[in-house]
Amino acid sequence: MIKFLNINSEKPYIHFQSLYQEALDNGQKGIEAISVSSYNQIKNEVEARYVNLKYISNNDWIFFSNYNSPKASQFESHSQVSILIFWASINTQIRMKAKIFKTSDEFSDEHFQGRTREKNALAISSNQSQIINSFDEVEKNFNETLQVMTPETPRPNFWGGYSFTPYYFEFWQGHENRLNKRHVFEQL
């Protein structure tokens, strides 16, 4: 589920919230999954991956990740991203273009402290996108981390939030006979 904090009253945000509720009412699975595409300057290619959108606060759309991951270095070197959401339950696609940046340490700390112990152990123990010998190694690291964690275990500095602020929205809704609706909002 996405948490809406101080939702922006501009039209694309209100439209998104309305579609989100409609998709939720229609049983959309994985409703918080969004595809974020970034540019890999080293390989001169675009890469996409799914992340879980956690918050929309004013103009900021926020998810959390490992700051040592390949996507993190891509965000650092090229802050332009493209976002895609598809909700099959209402045949709706939402595209966004945005600039991305890290959230404050305080916001990341607050979110980390509100998560389950297991999720935090995974964030701490995961060597995201690194080559490993086997999945057994992942499970071992996770279980060892879980055993030593306490409620006071702090957020690791290599894990935290990312926030993007869309300047372009495209809402596409499929209809019969390909008579589809498309609404575009762009900040000029």
PLM regions and their residue ranges:
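Binding-site signature for planar aromatic cofactors or substrates
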Residues: 1-188
